[in-house]
Structures are given as structure tokens and as C-alpha cells.
Amino acid sequence: GETMTDSPYSAIRHQQISVFPGEFSGSEEALFCLVSSKPLSSQAHDALVASAQSLGYHACQLAFIILATQADTAPALSTQPKDLFLVLEAVDPFAIVLTDHHAVEVASSAYNVPLTLEQRELLLGHGCCCFESFEELLKTTEGKQKAWKCLKTLPLLSVL
């Protein structure tokens, strides 16, 4: 029962997402994308959803992308940088959060830019935050503050 606008663009987007070698959940029209190389803990998931909401994004405007890594699939089926590039550009979010080292590496290759951890970055105009391990940061108050300091640099969704 997803309602999809019948524009050629949404059909192309749906096609790109459907062939993505990895997991894609959430909205195909997401404005806020979370990329990780393995499923997030419920604590990390909830913290990221709460962060997105505090920046003005609605839970239905989020997408979660989990890369398929070689450890759990045949190498041919693992997510390549170009796969991540295609899926992110198909969705075209305002904000991208890379939650772990492998996700940062793949995105860095995908966009051919060096990415700095815990500092505001731009990926072809998308606001981006990169974390070595978002889950580790959540274990301490200081870590949570560091994570939020980066997350709050992401584009705010101005409420109309």
C-alpha cells in the first residue's frame, strides 16, 4: 500500500532502489538517509530517529540503508561504492548519516571525496555526518554530545 506518485522519476527511483544490493527500508522519497554496514542496535536506531525529528524531519521521511558486506554475502553481492551512489542519488535526501567506518569508506569511494569523521561534510550537496561508530559514541555522555554536535549541523527541515 505505498502511494507512489506516477512520475517517471519515482519509477526510476523505485527501480534503482529495487536493484540495490543491500537492505533499503523506509521511504523511497526520504529526506534523511541513515547508512550503516550492519543493522543498527535499537538504541542507535532510536537515537538517530530522535535526532532527525529534532531537526524537523518526520519519521516517515527517513530511510535506512544497510550495506551488504562481504562477510555475509558472496563478494559479488556486496554493496559496491557505485551501488551506494546510485541509491543515494535516486533518493536524493537533504541529509545523510554514515554510522560506521565501513559505511564512511564506501561513501567516500562512491563520491570520490575524502570524508572527515564527526564534522559536517557535503556529498554532492547533501549534508552529511560520518561516524567511526555511532553505537560506540552512544555509550558515554561525552560521546552522545559529540554525535549530536555533528548531527545538528545537518540541514534543518524548515517547518512550513
Predicted regions and their residues:
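A polyanion-binding, active-site-adjacent surface
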Residues: 1-160
